[in-house]
Amino acid sequence: MLCLPVFIILLLLASPAASNPLEKRIQNDLIRAALEDADMENDPRSIIDSVKTFCCSTFNLGICCSKK
């Protein structure tokens, strides 16, 4: 009777769905390093400028086209 629960626990530990904390940390570090290398950070000002340019060229509204 003890054999079945032990087998199930060992099966769960050996399954690929069980996450390995070290692997997860390494993957997170690699993703972070890749994003830093690719300089994937968005500059909020450039996004706002892009939206304003699109709004001004498409809708020609005074709100979008106003220069400060």
Curated annotation (Swiss-Prot):
Expressed by the venom duct. Contains 2 disulfide bonds that can be either 'C1-C3, C2-C4' or 'C1-C4, C2-C3', since these disulfide connectivities have been observed for conotoxins with cysteine framework V (for examples, see AC P0DQQ7 and AC P81755). Its main location: secreted. Residues 1-19 form the signal peptide. One of its GO terms (molecular function) is toxin activity. The cysteine framework is V (CC-CC). This is Conotoxin Ar5.3.
